[in-house]
Structures are given as C-alpha cells and as structure tokens.
UniProtKB/Swiss-Prot annotation:
Encoding gene (name): ponA1
Organism of provenance: Mycolicibacterium smegmatis (strain ATCC 700084 / mc(2)155)
Cellular compartments annotated: Cell membrane
Start and end residues of each stretch annotated as Disordered: 1-61, 605-626, 690-726, 738-785
Name of the protein this chain belongs to: Penicillin-binding protein 1A
Positions of region (Transpeptidase): 392-662
Active site (catalytic residues): E151 (proton donor), S426 (acyl-ester intermediate)
Compositionally biased tracts (Low complexity): 759-775
Membrane-spanning segments: 77-97
Enzyme Commission (EC) number: 2.4.99.28, 3.4.16.4
KO phenotype (gene knockout): Probably essential. In a depletion mutant growth rate is dramatically impaired, cells are short with bulbous poles and/or rounded internal regions.
Role of this protein: Cell wall formation. Synthesis of cross-linked peptidoglycan from the lipid intermediates. The enzyme has a penicillin-insensitive transglycosylase N-terminal domain (formation of linear glycan strands) and a penicillin-sensitive transpeptidase C-terminal domain (cross-linking of the peptide subunits).
Functional pathway: Cell wall biogenesis; peptidoglycan biosynthesis
Length: 785
C-alpha cells in the first residue's frame, strides 16, 4: 500500500500531576529515599480554565480568612472547662475526704508530773515544743475576741475559707510573688498546722492550698465554730517554744490562761503573725504597733469599747530565759521525771512519741515532806565532804510500794545512783537471817563468833570484835561477819538460800546493766559464799523495797512512782489505789522475827534512834575497797511500819577511799545513818508513832530472847551462858559550850559476870567488818594478810 500522505496530528503525552515521573521513582527506590513529590499544578485563573495570571488566587493579593464561629465555640468550651473542672474536682474531693472528729487529732503537748499533794515536780516537754491543751471555756472571751480581731474578723460567719486568699495563692504560685501569703481564715490556719503541712511555693504549695480549702470547708460544716477555735488556740505557735494559748500565757506572763486580761490577750494575739520577731524582748516597737492594731480591730468588731481600748496599757512580759527555765526540770526532780517517764512507758506499753501527744497529768506517790527531808539530809551531811562523795536515798511506803522520797543525785541530767548496782555489805545479812528462820532456826540459836578460815582465807570481825558464842540476833546487832558466815553454811542450800530470800523480799533479779543479780557467773548461776556479806550488786531502790517487805510482815508491793494518770480530756487512765499489787512473799512469822532482831540496831549504831522514841528496825553495811583496807561503800537501811528508807554513801567512781572531811573512814553507822535518821525523822514528823507486830514463835523463840534459854534439840549446839548486862559509854568531845559530839565507837563496861567469863562481849559498838568484794577463795571476805 502506498504511503498515506495525509497529515497526522501529534498529541502531547497526558500526565497525571499526582504521579511522580517513573525515572524519579526508580532512582529514589535505589537510593533508599522517599520519592519526590511533584509540584502542585497551578490553579485555574479567575476567568476559567487558562493559566492564572498575576491577579489569580495564588498571587500576593490572597487573604487568610478566620472562622470566628469556631473561635467562639472553642473559647466557650475552654472557659467551661476552666470553671467546671475545679468545681467537679472540689466536689469529688469534698465527698471523698474524711474530716476527723474534734479531739481525734493528736498534737504534741506537755505532761505534768505532780507530787502526792498536787504540787508540780516536773514537766515532760516533747521535742516539738511546749503545749498544754485547754477547753474553750477556760479561755477568757476577750482573749478569743483579740485572736479573731488579729486573724479572722468574720470567723463566726465565714464558711471556713477565704476565696480572696485562695485566688492570691494561685496567682503567686503560678506567676510568682513570694510564695503563699495571708488571707487564711482561722479554720484554714488550723487545717494547715494540724493536717496538711506548710509547703509554701510552686505546684506543691498550690496543691497544699487546695487541700486546705477542701478540708476547711468540710470542717466548717461538721465542727462547731467553738470546736475549731479551741483546736486552733491549742495548736498555734506563739514563740518562746510555746505552742497553744495556755503555754503562751505561762511563757510571756507566768500565769494561767484564765487570768489573762485584755491587754495581755491582745499581745498574744498580735504575736501569731510573726511570733519570733514580734516578741517584745526582740522588737518592742513592732510588738506595740501590732498590739495597737489588734486593739483597734477589737473595737471594729464590737468586742471592745473605744473607752476601754483607750485605757489599755502595753503589758510587761517575763524575760525569755525565765520561760525557758520554767520548762527545765532541775536538781533531784530531774531524776524523778526520768523514772516516772520510764514507768509510764512500761505501764501503758507505749513509746515516747505517743506519750508526748497525751497531755497527761501524772500524780505520783512522792511526799513533798519526805522528799524535802531526804534532800535536806543529803545536803547537810555531804556539805564540806570530798567533792567526789555521792549519796542516794529511797523511801518506800511498805503498805503500798509507793515511793515517798527519791534522791539519786543533785544533777537532773546526771547519773542516778539510786538505780546503780552497788555492793551492799552487811546490810545483806538480813536475808541470811530470813533464810534461817524459814528453815526453823530461831533468833535464840547460838553460834560461834570467833575467827574462821575457809580454803586458806581468814574471815574475821573488825578489831577482833565478837560475842563468843551468842544468839544470831545478837550477832546481827553487832554485825559479826564470822557468825553469819557460819549461819549461811548451815543453811540447806547455803548461799543459794540467801539469794532466794533476797529475791523473795524484793531484790530485783535483773536491772539495766545486770542481767542476773546475785549470780557468780552473771548468767543466772548460783552465788557463792560472799553473798551473805553483800558481795553482789543491788540497787538502793531494791534494798528499800526488800526491807519494806519485812516492814509489811512479808507482803511485797512492787515499788512505783505513778499513783494516778489523767489525760487532757479528764479521763482517768490509771489509778494505783484500785490496783492490788500485794503479794505475800515471806511468811509473816519470819518477817516479824527479823524485824524484832533489827530493832536494837539503830540505837546500837552510834545512837541513831528515831525521834520521839519511834520504834525502827535497821541494818548498816560497809564494803571494803579491794584489798586496800579502806572503805568503798557505806549503807544504812531501816524502816518503821509506815516507811522504809535505804541510804547509800560512796564516791563517783568507787575507786578511792571513802573518808569523811577529817580523813576518818566512813562506816554504815556514820554518815549513812546520819542521813537515814534525818530523812526518817523529817518524813514522819507529826505522824502517829506505830509499833511493830509481836512475832510468833519460830524454833522455840518468839522474837529476840529476853533471857538465856536452851535452844530446842533440833536447833543446834548448846548455848553458852547468857550475856551479861553492860553499860555503854560513848566518848565525846565538847566543840562548843554545851555541845558535844561522839568520837569513835562506844565502850561497854560489863556489870554482870566478871570480865573474861564465857559469853562476855568484847568491844561492842564497833563498826562491822568492811566487806571486800571479790576476794580470792571466799568472795566478800577480807583478803589474807
């Protein structure tokens, strides 16, 4: 076919503007990059389908158009969210949050320790500060008005919060402004201090403020306004370590809150804003300005007339140091506070943190008269002595176990010697006598007082003192080591029986620092022979308690300080008078016979009979300082039917000789007996003179034999002839006209059998042999020469 010579039209290729060129797509795939997007096609011109010219929509003359309808809708939604979301959140929080009942919120507050007559001994001030809660009706109305004038003038009408204060908090925390600022109501301030804390800046501060707002609002609906105001006035800080209006009243004016006048109440209200810097002792002008502002506020709210306001005078305050000292327990009372606190923790099985929130009023068994007598006696007889000399005194009521006097030292924060473990010397012989009587050995049982030797160790009495073969009652009076060592060996279980009798009477089986008392191995094993001579450690408290058991005819009462405990709400938590802690530990006949044997000893010990011929039963004790021949400790323990008192005298470390101001050795019949007599006489002055019960028979003897008598066949070896009558001559020296003092031990002159007759006494009245604890072979015996 011949070629077609007709003209053909060449059409350009049709391209889809949304599809990239194939070559570009392949190249992009090979290079691992996204394919390029083609440029958008030009929009059509205004006039139709041709290319747009300069005046088309793509040119610079195009305007961006705002859809105001959607803007209005979005703004409305945002405002709704900003308003509704906080309200919804507030409502949910209001429903969820639990507001405690009035009185359920525990805040640290002071507990007061009182003597038996209601006088104050000490105050237990918690670390968080000094606070004593009071009821709203104890706070004068004008004081309440002053606080409202200073802090919340529409307190009784507002809903518990301030919107202006809350909005200011939002502004300051979101945009700066120095942290949260004033405007809080009294309710909000209370919630902040008691429940939500005091974070003051940033988002945390804003959250805290929101919590405060919710709780304050709900609290205002559930608590009465008086309950809120009472709680607030008991928790707010006033400076000088005083939390609450009651403590502040004492800290600034040294008076109870009930006695505050208008001017004083206005000053305390003025301090709330800046308690430390507005203290009149720090900034008197600033305090006066704020005080005047509060008084003017009282006029504004109608709580004070202008005439009364004009009559007010700025009140004087006590020095800040005085307020601090009021919260510090000093002298021996500090050690009483320590023991009362420990007893409370044990009594209620609580910790100190819990104790510090109770605001307790603790009435103790301490008798102010007995306490004063003990302190005065120690001060009198230790005056002028070695500065290292120390003393301890404990007096206990045998009928209850109540501690009537307690002296462990003069330093409130120092070492308490009444709680120290100390060797007791011959005062422990009493428990050997208890054990002997329990085994049927009567007071008339005769025993040799001559020297003896055990395992190569010689045991003797001071200056060769002895009574030949005499009764165990006479040997106790003379404090003969040799006689009681032999008596202990005669017991069924020897030293173990002595220890058991001591524990039964009230010597503690353990105390802080000593896991097992009266134990040679310290692990509860048996004691050795030195126990009869007081080798092992006991406390002054324990000795007073054990002797009190004898005074009570064998009935033990646990020694205690706490008589009654009342909390800040007036609820009685404990009343010792309703507790029955008496327990018969020792047979009555045994205890009464021991008392009979001890009755002559106070007079025998250098004339320490009690005033007015009051009967007493007592025993001295002296402990030797190692193998030096000097003394280390000296004791006097004794009682009447109504009071048992133990006295110890020694030195701070127990490593130096115990001598008086004249350089003479101190024995139990010396300074300790002086202190004991002065304490007992002072404590018992004005009380009835009581007699001890008449003992019943044990081993053929009812009490101390009054005439020679042969012991029953089972009681032991035959007796020596009876003891002759003696006249006691006490050497004295006149130190001033008409005033004499004794010097040295008394001398006796026999008026019965001639000197040297069997059983005649030798040197009675001499002090007992000091006991050397830990001597080799026979603990408690003097070392070999």
């Amino acid at each position: 076919m011949p070629p077609d010579d007709r003209l053909t039209a060449v059409l350009p290729p049709v391209r889809d503007g949304d599809i990239a060129p194939p070559i570009d797509v392949v190249r992009a795939a090979l290079e691992g990059s996204p394919p390029p997007k083609p440029p958008p096609p030009p929009p059509p011109g205004r006039g139709g389908g041709g290319p747009s010219g300069p005046g088309g929509p793509s040119g610079p003359g195009r305007q961006f158009r705002i859809n105001w309808k959607w803007v209005r809708r979005g703004s409305a939604i945002a405002v709704a969210v900003m308003v509704l979301l906080p309200l919804i959140t507030f409502g949910m929080a209001y429903m969820i949050v639990d507001v405690p009942e009035p009185g359920d919120i525990r805040t640290p507050q002071v507990s007061t320790i009182l003597a038996s007559d209601g006088s104050e001994i000490a105050r237990i001030v918690p670390p968080e500060g000094n606070r004593v809660d009071v009821k709203i009706d104890q706070i004068p109305v004008h004081v309440r008005d002053a606080v409202m004038a200073a802090e919340d003038r529409d307190f009784y009408s507002n809903p518990g919060f301030s919107w202006t204060g809350f909005l200011r908090a939002i502004k300051n925390n979101l945009f700066g402004g120095g942290g949260l600022q004033g405007g809080s109501t009294i309710t909000q301030q209370y919630v902040k201090n008691a429940l939500v804390g005091d974070e003051r800046s940033g988002i945390g501060g804003l959250i805290r403020k929101a919590k405060e707002l919710v709780i304050s609002t709900k609290m205002s609906g559930e608590w009465s306004k008086d309950a809120v105001l009472q709680a607030y006035l008991n928790i707010i800080y006033f400076g000088r370590g005083a939390y609450g209006i009651s403590a502040a009243s004492k800290a600034y004016f040294d008076k109870p809150v009930e006695q505050l006048d208008v001017a004083e109440g206005a000053l305390l209200a003025a301090l709330i804003q800046r308690p430390s810097t507005l203290d009149p002792a720090v900034d008197p002008e600033g305090a006066a300005d704020r005080w005047n502002w509060v008084l003017d506020g009282m006029v504004d709210i109608g709580a004070l007339s202008q005439a009364d306001r004009d009559a007010q005078v700025f009140p004087p305050t006590v020095p800040p140091d005085y307020a601090f000292q009021q919260n510090q327990t000093t002298g021996p009372n500090g050690l009483i506070e320590r023991q009362v606190t420990n007893e409370l923790l044990d009594l209620f099985d609580i910790n100190e943190q819990t104790l510090n929130t109770e605001g307790l009023q603790i009435t103790t068994t301490i008798d102010p008269k007995a306490q004063e007598a003990a302190v005065d006696a120690v001060d009198k007889y230790l005056e002028g002595q070695d500065p290292d000399m120390r003393a301890a005194v404990v007096s206990i009521d045998p009928r209850t176990g109540g501690i009537k006097a307690y002296y462990g030292g003069s330093d409130a924060n120092g070492f308490d010697f009444a709680q120290a473990g100390l060797p007791t010397g011959s005062s422990f012989k009493v428990f050997a006598l208890v054990a002997a009587l329990q085994q049927g050995i009567g007071l008339g049982y005769q025993i040799d007082s001559g020297p003896l030797e055990v395992n190569g160790i010689k045991i003797g009495n001071v200056e060769g003192e002895g009574c030949g073969t005499c009764s165990i009652a006479e040997a106790l009076k003379r404090s003969l080591n040799t006689s009681y060592y032999r008596l202990m060996l005669k017991l069924e279980n020897g030293p173990a029986d002595v220890a058991e009798a001591a524990h039964d009477a009230g010597v503690a089986e353990s105390f802080p620092g000593v896991e097992h008392t009266l134990s040679e191995d310290g692990k509860g094993g048996p004691p050795n022979n030195g126990v009869v001579l007081g080798q092992y450690q006991s406390r002054v408290l324990d000795m007073a308690s054990a002797y009190a058991t004898l005074a009570a005819s064998g009935v033990y009462h646990k020694p205690h300080f706490v008589e009654k405990v009342v909390n800040s709400s007036g609820q009685v938590l404990f009343d010792a008078s309703k507790e029955d802690n008496g327990e018969e530990r020792i047979d009555k006949a045994v205890a009464d016979n021991v008392t009979s044997a001890m009755q002559p000893i106070a007079g025998w010990s250098r004339g320490h009979n009690l005033a007015g011929g009051r009967p007493s039963a007592a025993k001295t004790g002296t402990v030797q300082l190692g193998d030096t021949g000097d003394n280390r400790d000296a004791w006097m323990v004794g009682y009447t039917p109504s009071l048992s008192t133990a006295v110890w005298v020694g030195t701070t470390e127990g490593v130096k000789p115990l001598v008086n101001k004249w350089g003479s050795p101190i024995y139990g019949s010396g300074l300790p007996s002086d202190i004991w007599k002065a304490t007992m006489d002072g404590a018992l002055e004005g009380t009835d003179v009581e007699s001890f019960p008449k003992p019943t028979e044990i081993g053929g003897y009812a009490g101390v034999p009054q005439a020679p008598a042969a012991p029953p066949p089972s009681a032991g070896p035959p007796t020596d002839p009876g003891q002759p009558s003696v006249t006691v001559i006490q050497p004295t020296i006149e130190v001033a006209p008409g005033i004499t003092i004794p010097i040295g031990p008394p001398t006796t002159v026999p008026v019965g059998p001639p000197p040297g007759a069997p059983g005649a006494p030798v040197g009675p009245g001499a002090p007992e042999v000091p006991v050397a604890p830990g001597a080799p072979g026979v603990p408690g015996a003097p070392p070999p020469p």
